[in-house]
Amino acid sequence: MAVVKKRRNVVVGEVHIYATYNNVIVTIADQQGHVLVTTSAGACNFKGSKKATPYAAQETVARAVKAVVERNGMRTVSVCISGPGAGREAAIRAVQTCNLNVTSIRDTTKLPHNGCKLPKRRRV
């Protein structure tokens, strides 16, 4: 888990959760966008296909939130989630159970409006 060394008292922040099919990446920043903590399921000792599970997302978010609450005293967050992964709902629930006041939940998953042509299907 990457933690910024400078200790500041940050009461309000943002939790960015990127849930892919293979991993979950969590970044916690203050309102100006300065990163306080970033971690992933792989950094929390989940390897292989276990990184894509909802439990891995829950544990990853819980570790990141615990670190930022202890170091910076964060109390209020807004959650921004993106990606199609399996751990989306579990990650949001983990933020809500960590004694943080959640002001908003935004979904910023990018969806194509019939954009680029997909690669041709593999024949075995």
Curated annotation (Swiss-Prot):
Gene3D superfamilies: Ribosomal protein S11. Coiled coil: none annotated. The keyword Ribonucleoprotein applies. Pfam families: Ribosomal_S11. InterPro entries: Ribosomal_uS11, Ribosomal_uS11_bac-type, Ribosomal_uS11_sf. HAMAP family: Ribosomal_uS11. NCBIfam families: PRK05309.1, uS11_bact. Belongs to the universal ribosomal protein uS11 family. This is Small ribosomal subunit protein uS11. It comes from Anaplasma marginale (strain St. Maries).
